[in-house]
Curated annotation (Swiss-Prot):
Cell cycle among keywords: no
A Pfam family hit: TerD
Family stated for the protein in its record: Belongs to the CAPAB/TerDEXZ family.
Statement: the UniProt record of this protein carries the keyword Acetylation: no
Lineage: Bacteria, Pseudomonadati, Pseudomonadota, Betaproteobacteria, Burkholderiales
Function: Not known; seems to contribute to the tellurium resistance (Ter) mechanism.
Organism this protein belongs to: Alcaligenes sp
Stored InterPro entries: Stress/Tellurium_Resist, TerD
Protein name (Swiss-Prot/TrEMBL): Tellurium resistance protein TerD
Assigned keywords, A-Z: Plasmid, Tellurium resistance
GO BP: response to tellurium ion
Intrachain S-S bonds: none
Amino acid sequence: MSVSLSKGGNVSLSKTAPSMKNVLVGLGWDARSTDGQDFDLDASAFLLAANGKVRGDADFIFYNNLKSADGSVTHTGDNRTGEGDGDDESLKIKLDAVPGDVDKIIFVVTIHDAQARRQSFGQVSGAFIRLVNDDNQTEVARYDLTEDASTETAMLFGELYRHNGAWKFRAVGLGYAGGLASVCAQYGINAS
């Protein structure tokens, strides 16, 4: 049975899904009606060390870097429309393969070309992040984002993190007005 999380809520994967080794993180959204400009939202993951920063640029997993160097995190590909039901983009994580010096994996969604297209998360509805046991396709946890993010062009949906040697997932829902560049700057990536 899936755990429904509120903003800030967390769930222990060792208690909820003790045998889970492979995680599918599904992210979804719907674009509200716009002036005709296409909406292209992009999911990404950042592998963070204890200092809250990436160890190097290879720890930024996105549509131009689909797999971490160690193979522990894989982006399944870019969906340029976000149309249809279910997950719009997803990432797969092999928990046992995540390097020991990675404390946290954050999952971010950004709006491509948001400034030029004058788009924000205020024009996005039905946004969610869900964790699925990729071995048996059972949904473990889900967070439906309900915040009004009228100026934000990037959103940290959720994070997997180590706590006392076990993995946990937290629903975050933190918006960034500066888009992907501001997220990258915060976590140690030079996005210029």
